[in-house]
Amino acid sequence: MRRSAVAVLAAGLFLTGAGSAVADAWHTMPKLRSEGVVLKNGKYTMYPKFTKHGGFGFKVDLQDDNAADGHNVYVQARVEGYSWRRFNGQQRKTVRIQKEVYDGAALYVSNAWIRACRDRGSLRPDNCTRTLHHKR
């Protein structure tokens, strides 16, 4: 009796772990480009409940596509109900950015958005790529 209970418990834990691994799978993002900025080699995931706040995780290469213009580049990401969070890149370089964005009041998020922009200063508006929308 005791051995069968342990076997059932072990099988249940294994299947729970396998289910979490599938929910935590990374998906490919399309390459995004706008004047002066490129977001490439992107992957994203929607974390399951109780894992990294159930948030939206992403890892991308952010490239300053026009080194001569003197402008910085950045990634913006947000989840439902919250404003954009900004993650800066570097001028004249390609940097790897890996972050999580989440709603601290919820077990998990269902919708997330991401885009890349070029910071053109305070007098001119920034130009951004199209916004990608990801759903759980």
Give the predicted meaning of each segment.
Residues 24-136:
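Post-signal peptide N-terminal regions of Sec-secreted extracellular proteins
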Residues 1-23:
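Secretory targeting and sorting signals
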